Design a protein with these regions (language model features):
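Gly/Ser/Thr-rich active-site loops/lids in small-molecule metabolic enzymes
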Residues: 155-197
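ATP/nucleoside-binding phosphotransfer catalytic cores, i.e., glycine-rich phosphate-binding loops
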Residues: 123, 131, 145, 149-150, ...
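Solvent-exposed alpha-helices and their adjacent loops that cap or buttress functional pockets
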Residues: 2-3, 37-40, 62-63, 101-105, ...
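ATP/NTP phosphate-donor binding region
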Residues: 1-48, 53-65, 84-104, 113-123
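Catalytic core of DAGKc-family lipid kinases
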Residues: 77-156
Length: 271
């Protein structure tokens, strides 16, 4: 990762509030020697909008470890967008005059999709991967921990969330919230069926670093990464592996010292 910021780039959500904040940043930055660029080799990326804008910025720059990412929210405090409009001047001062920027690692999951014809797709997820039936129809799949069968499941699918994304779709599906700050995955089944006709599901596991969650579907499935459905022929998917290790991460600017508890209290509970 680059230790010094010489150039930075803006990713702006297409709404009036976000555009106004971007204009303020451009005006303030005219007095500095750090140019704004549009290339993927910028040292710093500033996402302006919501957490979705941050995810789009990281995805567009291919989860680069050579970039420092930060975000300015235009609504409520986010888990990724932890700066607000009032922090703009301090941010410009910080990136222009600090000798060494304080960063922290935000871990991502790695999703590998193995097709029946031998081809493989690889994706990274900041928030979650959802493996579900086409149009969230009922599916049956086998769930493995590494090479060992854990359970056979019939339901609408499974959400595999990072510790960053476990308060998003995963929590809406009654998934656990991980406060450990460890590199691990929170797995939540989507409306699993439990009756005499189907094998009873066992658990929603939390998968630690360097352990693979392996899913082998019996039906056609869809792969949704951070809210975006991947264009893969669902009838060709033979196996999906999701893992998280210390080598999968992005570098995030760490100016504000918000705890996960305080963000949940502010963003989700509203007090």
């Amino acid at each position: 990762m680059k230790n010094e910021v010489k150039t930075f780039r803006l990713f702006v959500r297409p709404d009036e509030k976000s555009r106004q904040i971007a204009d303020k940043i451009r005006a303030l930055n005219e007095r500095t020697t750090h140019p704004l660029v549009e290339s993927d080799d910028a040292d710093l990326v500033i996402a302006i909008g919501g957490d979705g804008t941050f995810i789009d910025a990281v995805t567009s720059t291919k989860f680069s470890k050579n970039i420092i990412y930060t975000g300015i929210h235009t609504g409520t405090l986010g888990f990724l967008q932890d700066l607000c409009e009032n922090d703009i001047f301090s941010l410009i001062q910080y990136i222009n005059y600090e000798q060494e920027l304080k960063t922290r690692k935000v871990y991502t999951s790695c999703v590998k999709v193995y097709l029946k014809d031998g081809n493989t797709y690889k994706f990274f997820a900041l928030n979650e991967a959802i493996i579900a039936g086409d149009n969230y129809s009922k599916i049956t799949f086998a769930e493995y921990i590494n090479d060992e069968l854990l359970q056979n499941v019939t339901g609408n699918g499974i959400v595999v969330a990072t510790s960053t994304g476990d308060t998003a779709y995963s929590s809406n599906a009654n998934g656990a919230i991980d406060f450990s700050n460890n590199c691990q995955l929170v797995c939540t089944l989507l409306t699993p069926i439990r009756n005499a006709a189907y094998e009873r599901f066992i658990t929603n596991p939390i998968i630690c670093s360097r352990i693979n969650l392996v899913l082998k579907p019996c039906d056609n499935i869809s792969i949704i990464i951070d809210g975006k459905k991947k264009n893969i022929d669902s009838s060709m998917i033979g196996r999906v592996e999701v893992s998280m290790t210390n080598s999968y991460y992005i570098n995030k600017l760490d100016i504000m010292d918000y705890s996960k508890v305080s963000i949940i209290r502010n963003k989700i509970l509203g007090y």
